[in-house]
Amino acid sequence: MKRYIYNILILLSVGLLFSCQSSHKKLLNSNNNDAKYEAAVKAYEKGDYYKANQLFENLILYFRGKDKAEDVNMYYGKSLMEDGQYYVAGYQFENFVRWFPYSPKAEEALYLSAYCKYKESPDFYLDQTLTQESIKAFKDYIAKYPESPRVQEANKCLDELRMKLIQKDYTQAYNYYKVGQYQAAQTALKGFINKYADQTKYRQDAMYYIVLADYHFAMGSVEEKKKERWNNMILDYERYQALFENFTDKTKIEDLKSKYEFAKKELENLK
């Protein structure tokens, strides 16, 4: 008996699903655009964003130039965004700003176009073109609406996006050290420090690996180059020590200190 009831419930659920799908398809193909609009808004409010964006997309041409045009276009962009279709949603919000530049919703649309790019921004080790586009979009938004309450959130997103670029640049510079290209590591890590002087954490790591790269580079040098390169290592170590001695774990400090003492002995032997 229980199995029979269970099977009946399954059949009813499947039937209801097909009925809903059939009703949605009929509505999409109908000419009753007011009913379609009401159904689209209800679907959006219920969180059925896929159905909502299908219906709103279907309504854009019909409502062009009419009172509901702004609402339809804004709902369409938001339903795409909520459905996770950030690339298409961002494009729709950009269109909204172009089509309705004087709308009260234009500010929100400009912010959401930047936000959609932010959501599309990949992990730091991948290509960062979208990250850079999102940074530009948020900067443009802040420049245009500096008093907006959304500026605080925009700045948070900007900080996160910039950190991705910093991580990528640091990782690329560090990778030269990792593969034993010590001269290239020195150049890349020093370039990183100059570019991001305000980034204490990565600056500390970069300077640590500069000293290590100096050490390995000097160790592998021909005799006539060793004096210059040991001197460079000593100078870089002393800069590191002055800035970060109290902020570095003891293992790293002891490791660098032993290499520093070795460098001084090598210089004494070269006199």
Language-model features: locations:
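Acidic, polar-rich low-complexity tracts and alpha-helical solenoid repeat scaffolds
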Residues: 5, 19-271
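Sec-dependent bacterial lipoprotein signal peptides
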Residues: 1-20
